[in-house]
C-alpha cells in the first residue's frame, strides 16, 4: 500500500513540475525592458545576438565566391605551383 501511495505522489509531482517551469519561462519573457533600441548598437562594434537575432551573411561578407572550384580526387591530378 505504501508503494502505491509513493507512486501516486511521484505521478502528481511529475504533472505539477512541468507546469511550474513553463510559467517561470513565460514570466522571464515578460520582464524584458521594452525600451531597448537595437539601432543604438549599430556602428558600436556590439552584436547583441540573443535578443535581436543572428547577423545574416551578405554577399559582400563572403570573399572568394567566384574562386571556388571542384577538383577530382583520383590521385592523378597535378597541381600547379603558380597559385
Swiss-Prot record:
Annotated disulfide bonds: none
Keyword Signal: yes
Chain residues in the propeptide: 57-83
Protein location: Secreted
Cellular component terms (Gene Ontology): cytoplasm; extracellular region
GO MF: hormone activity; neuropeptide hormone activity; prolactin receptor binding; prolactin-releasing peptide receptor binding
GO biological process, one term: reduction of food intake in response to dietary excess
Name of the molecule in the record: Prolactin-releasing peptide
Organism: Rattus norvegicus (Rat)
Gene: Prlh
Amino acid at each position: 500500500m505504501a508503494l502505491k501511495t509513493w507512486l501516486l505522489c511521484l505521478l502528481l509531482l511529475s504533472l505539477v513540475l512541468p507546469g511550474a517551469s513553463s510559467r517561470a519561462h513565460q514570466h522571464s519573457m515578460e520582464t524584458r525592458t521594452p525600451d531597448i533600441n537595437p539601432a543604438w548598437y549599430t556602428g558600436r562594434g556590439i552584436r547583441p545576438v540573443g535578443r535581436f537575432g543572428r547577423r545574416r551573411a551578405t554577399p559582400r561578407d563572403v570573399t572568394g565566391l567566384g574562386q571556388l572550384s571542384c577538383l577530382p580526387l583520383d590521385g592523378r591530378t597535378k597541381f600547379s605551383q603558380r597559385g
